[in-house]
Every structure is written in structure tokens, then in C-alpha cells.
Amino acid sequence: MEIIKITQATDYLAQMVALFRVELRSYKGIVSKPNVDAGREEMEEYLAAGFPVFAAIVDGEYAGYVVCRVDSEVVWVESIFVKDEYRRHGVATALHSKAEEIAASYGEETVYNYVHPNNHRMIAFLRKRGYTVLNLIEIRKPYGGEKTTKIIKVGENEFDY
């Protein structure tokens, strides 16, 4: 496996970003199809903003990617995705390790991770890597027409979900 720095959006990356967005929507019960044009636009925005982006190449094929955001020497994993056929083969570990290398280069001990609450695989992955501290929660107003289906409790607070 090779981890390469990405400097321009490619069709392969656009497809993976589109698949990542489909997967994220599925965590809320939304069925959608990959939008490769939107995936390309998203990747181009990351690159234009100067976000470090890396891809994992396995046997000449793109297997996954990670997008990092560096804010005042704090590194956030903005998104990380591995294609189904490459999961559980060390690809996510290699990509996440790259994010940790960036954090270490700033003298930081941790990477901050955006994770959807229903993304149980990612939460389990992060736990195995020692990420067990809940740092922030994101709170917003409901979208027009959005129907929440659950209540999530964090400490003494309850939130629609």
C-alpha cells in the first residue's frame, strides 16, 4: 500500500467522495445515489482551501482517502473513506496514521475526528486507536421538513436526532 498526497481532484477521488456522501446519508435512513460531479466539487474545494488530502493506493487502485483540516495547529479529520472491498485491510489505519503524523508535526498528541453518531464502524475503529474522549457535539436547528426519529442523551441533555 502506498499513501500519496493529492494535489488535484481526479475521477477516482470524485467517485469515492460521492460514495462517502451516500454512506453518510444512509446513517440517517436516506437512500441516495452517488453524485460524482458533487464529489469532484467537494474535493476541489478541499484542495483550494489548502486542506491536506491523501489517498491510499493498493495494487494500483485508489482504495480510500483522508481529508485533514489544520486550524491553529489542530488537525481535524474532515473525512475519511475506504472503498468496501478494501475495508479491514489496514487502509483506514494507514490513512488515519497520516493525519496523526501531521498532528505530531505541529507538536500535537491527537487528531480530532468528525464522526456521525450512527457510524458505529468508525467509532469502533477510533476506539481501537485510543480515541475515547467526546470533545464537542454539533447542534443545529432542524431543516425544513426534517423529521427526527430519536432522542440522544449526552450528560444531562437530550437532543432530537
Where are the regions that the model predicts?
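Conserved acetyl-CoA-binding loop-helix of GNAT-fold acetyltransferases
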Residues: 82, 88-101, 120, 124, ...
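Glycine-rich acetyl-CoA-binding "A-motif" of GNAT/NAT acetyltransferases
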Residues: 61-64, 121, 133
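A short beta-loop-alpha structural element at the N-terminal edge
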Residues: 1-18
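Conserved GNAT acetyl-CoA-binding A-motif
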Residues: 103-115
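Conserved GNAT-fold acetyl-CoA-binding loop/helix
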Residues: 21-43
